[in-house]
Amino acid sequence: MVLLKISSLLAVLGLLVCQMYSSQAAPARRALEPLPDRVTEAHRLLRALIRELTAEDMEASSSGAAHKRSCDTSTCATQRLADFLSRSGGIGSPDFVPTDVSANSFGRRRRSLHV
């Protein structure tokens, strides 16, 4: 999404620069119009584009649809287990099956005593 916005902004900037060079080669406006006015007009156009892009970002970030992040760390696994226990009725529930969660259950290498 950000890449699309950046590429569109660069395309608009490129078109703006090309338009500025072509207007100096064959002016479509009055020749008496001062050059700084054209530059300020370009600045106004860029400011309006940037405001529009930031408004779209704010609108997208404030929308109700939040994206759920996935993580595989032990903290997230513990949090998912706690959520499951709270939804299922906890340890006092008749459907509760205790699991073996010890230091040797998973994630550790077994050390060989043979050297």
From Swiss-Prot:
One of its GO terms (cellular component) is extracellular space. One of its GO terms (molecular function) is calcitonin receptor binding. GO terms for biological process: adenylate cyclase-activating G protein-coupled receptor signaling pathway; regulation of cytosolic calcium ion concentration. Disulfide bonds join 71-76. The modification Phenylalanine amide is found at residue 106. Its main location: secreted. CGRP induces vasodilation. It dilates a variety of vessels including the coronary, cerebral and systemic vasculature. Its abundance in the CNS also points toward a neurotransmitter or neuromodulator role. PANTHER family: CALCITONIN (PTHR10505:SF16), CALCITONIN-RELATED (PTHR10505). This is Skin calcitonin gene-related peptide. It comes from Phyllomedusa bicolor.
